[in-house]
Regions:
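A short, N-terminal "cap"/entry segment at the start of jelly-roll beta-barrel domains
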Residues: 1-81, 181-185
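Double-stranded beta-helix
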Residues: 68-69, 75, 94-96, 104-106, 128-185
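A short beta-loop-beta micro-motif enriched in histidine and acidic residues
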Residues: 75-89, 104-105, 111-113
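Short, conserved beta-strand element in jelly-roll/cupin
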Residues: 83-100, 118
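A structural preference for long, well-packed, hydrophobic secondary-structure segments
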Residues: 86, 99-109, 126-127, 142, ...
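Conserved metal-binding segment of the jelly-roll/cupin
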Residues: 111-131, 140
């Protein structure tokens, strides 16, 4: 099946649709640095969840099989924040939301179950609104260190650490040959 990758969930095979992601190049807005070189990637309908009894487990499995770990299940904070020392993958397991990326002047993107986003270090994000059942699975590459930046004084240090955060070896959804590899050069 050309153009499609199969990902195994803990109980059943689930298709990971090989679609080109939407790329967002986000600029430093004076509070949120964003990444100076690499775009935010948003994969619409990246993972098929239609028959999954535990859709979050499907994302956990896809991320882990592609070398991204430290998974968690939750929502997205309702305030602008970013991580300056690590990249982050977000998979929408249930529901839908409007998420603002890049800071207060950044785009508001609607995400729904099955969508995934990959945020390079420094990418601001916050939940604008969400359905009551909204559930996200987050994951991180093995390189980097988790931090949470929310204050103006975090920015100066972040400008240095963001640039030093290495490119991950794999795309969290599609592995070693995923779109992230070409987009983050």
């Amino acid at each position: 099946m050309s153009g499609e990758t199969r990902a195994q969930s803990p109980k059943n095979a689930r298709a990971t649709q090989r679609l080109e992601p939407r790329l967002f190049r986000l600029e430093d807005d004076g509070f949120v640095p964003n990444h100076p070189r690499w775009p935010l990637l948003v994969y619409p309908a990246a993972v098929s969840l239609s028959e999954a009894p535990d859709p979050a487990a499907v994302f956990e499995d896809v991320f882990q099989r592609n070398g991204w770990g430290g998974t968690w299940r939750n929502g997205i904070y309702s305030y602008t924040h970013y991580h300056s020392q690590i990249h982050e993958a977000l998979g929408v397991a249930r529901g839908s939301a409007k998420v603002q990326f890049g800071g207060e002047r950044g785009p508001i993107v609607e995400v729904t179950a099955g969508d995934a986003a990959v945020l390079p270090a420094g990418t601001g994000h916050k939940r604008i609104e969400a359905s009551a059942d909204f559930l996200v699975v987050g994951a991180y590459p093995p390189e980097g260190r988790y931090d949470l930046c929310t204050r103006p004084e975090d920015r100066e240090r972040a400008l240095t650490t963001i640039a030093k955060t290495p490119r991950p070896a794999t795309d969290p959804v599609f592995g070693g040959e995923g779109p992230l590899i070409g987009a983050w050069t």
